[in-house]
């Protein structure tokens, strides 16, 4: 089994011990020779030469230790750089994980959109059918009032003032209705007329129109017949349309 090589520190300590022993022997020998006045220069010279040799080896080992110290400092700098790079790699790995998650989500959404597109293509509706459907909506006055609509007309646009007062919102808000409290008598609704407090107060409305107003479920033709084709009613219609436009602009 190979003996492990000693470290530089152990070798330095060993040289220091040898130098200490040789120095002590040399000093003791010099002191003894001075007290006994014996001259034996041969042994002293051997110890001195051995001491000089050990000192030279010690100096060489010190140079090795200094070079190893520089290498150790460089290693510490490199270790710090490695730690920094490792932190950067971990951060980059985290960002890559987030990007992978985002891409996976985007791919999934893209696949779902492609499925929706394929489904839409399989069940596509022609433009002619859409135009026909739009024409039906427009013809039934579902999005706008009829061209002959005037204030007091029970047709669209909904809701009318009568419906607002008799509805749930009118009951909750407790709007002042001149003693009616938002409710209409059942016989008045059944007869298709308004109470006196809710009768139209505009000068351009005829008494026949206020007394013969029909609920929304009656036909519109009967109401137009009640207006009559005479000249006075035509003038009233013009005034009514003017007031309607002005009232709509004020409400906007």
Swiss-Prot record:
What is the first-listed, main subcellular location in coarse terms? nucleus
Query: Localized where?
Result: Nucleus
One protein family per Pfam: Med4
- Gene Ontology terms, cellular component aspect? mediator complex
Q: Which residues form a coiled coil?
A: 70-112
Q: How does it assemble?
A: Component of the Mediator complex.
Q: What name is this protein filed under?
A: Mediator of RNA polymerase II transcription subunit 4
Q: What is the source species?
A: Xenopus tropicalis (Western clawed frog)
| Higher taxonomy | Eukaryota, Metazoa, Chordata, Craniata, Vertebrata
Q: Tell me the name of the encoding gene.
A: med4
